[in-house]
């Protein structure tokens, strides 16, 4: 079976670790976690994820800037980006910065899995 490659970028290491362990336990995904937004673009270039889950609010660089870096990279511009945030109003979307809709934290495994299926068809 060809496992989908997921990159989770969030400065909350406990959150990314929990998502990684939970998703990998299903046997369908290979998950890489990155807690530094400034390293996310380089990590994505090396890992070549099928989808990126990206926190909006991070120290040093925000998720919007990371998304713009990814979108401008010919190797990564096709990769779906799903924004993760605890700060969401019902009228906000991620489309204004080249991404896909937000998932509100705390994110359930069901919501995350459904999002992967919607974007990658698994």
Functional labels for PLM-detected ranges:
Residues 10, 55:
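Active-site residues of response regulator receiver
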Residues 34-38:
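Conserved Asp/Asn-Gly motif in the active-site loop of CheY-like receiver
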Residues 107-118:
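C-terminal output helix
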Residues 47-53:
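Active-site beta3 strand of CheY-like receiver
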Residues 82-84:
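Hydrophobic/aromatic residues positioned on beta-strands within the core alpha/beta folds
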Residues 13-32:
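Two-component/phosphorelay signaling modules centered on CheY-like receiver
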Residues 58:
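Receiver (REC) domain active-site loop signature in two-component systems and cognate sites
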């Amino acid at each position: 079976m060809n496992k989908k490659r997921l990159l989770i970028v969030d400065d909350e290491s406990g959150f990314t670790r929990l998502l990684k362990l939970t998703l990998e336990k299903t046997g369908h995904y290979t998950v890489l976690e990155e807690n530094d937004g400034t390293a996310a673009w380089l990590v994505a270039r090396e890992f070549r994820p099928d989808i990126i889950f990206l926190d909006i609010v991070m120290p040093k660089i925000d998720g919007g800037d990371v998304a713009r870096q990814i979108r401008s990279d010919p190797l990564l511009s096709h990769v779906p980006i799903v924004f993760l945030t605890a700060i969401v109003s019902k009228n906000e979307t991620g489309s204004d910065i080249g991404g896909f809709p937000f998932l509100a934290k705390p994110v359930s495994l069901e919501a995350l899995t459904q999002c992967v299926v919607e974007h990658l068809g698994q």
